[in-house]
Amino acid sequence: MHHYLPILLQIALVYLIALISPGPNFFMITQLSLAGRRGLGAASALGVGTGSTVWASLAMLGFATVLQRIDWLYNGIRIAGAIYLVWFGIKLVWASTKRGETIVVNVETPPAMRGAHFRAWRTGMLTCLTNPKSCAFWTSIFATLFPAHPPLWFYGVALAMIGMMSVGWYGSVALMFATERTQRGYRRLRRPIDGVCGALLVGLGAKLAAES
């Protein structure tokens, strides 16, 4: 068991570096946390954690490697991800041109908020799942760092670690941007912030679409 611990630490270190590098997940969670309530950012962080765990599971099962070899399917996911990011970014840019408008509707009734939390979770998961770079990342991780024929518990521990790291990091980002002080600043500068976040997401989507 002990000789598997350094491998888990290596995986954790590589994944931590990937997590703290700003990308679509980061910008999406940042905007939802700023525009909505604290719970919406946390729900989107949970969605990203779900998506990360799904990609890692597919890589463990070998599906991610197969996916990379089927050009039309891989490119289909890449284009779908690019369209999703561009669509989300355009919504933000459009909202930034409208006084008092955000892409998250803050409603007071508990059933509506439950629906908003589900939509935030779904947005986080789809943002992660439609990014084929996640497929390439986890395929390379399992090809280079995973031991040959590890015990079953190793897979379980690795998946749990990946999920907890993802939710922990993005949950912290959500909480940081959902504080009252940050919210007050966002309300003053909502339009330029939404415009910048939207433009960044559109740019990331365009870059993803242009990649071969």
Residue ranges of predicted features:
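Alpha-helical transmembrane segments and their lipid-water interface positions
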Residues: 25, 51, 55-63, 85-91, ...
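Hydrophobic alpha-helical transmembrane segments in multi-pass integral membrane proteins
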Residues: 58-60, 130, 135, 139, ...
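Selected transmembrane alpha-helices and immediately adjacent juxtamembrane segments
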Residues: 116-117, 124, 128-133
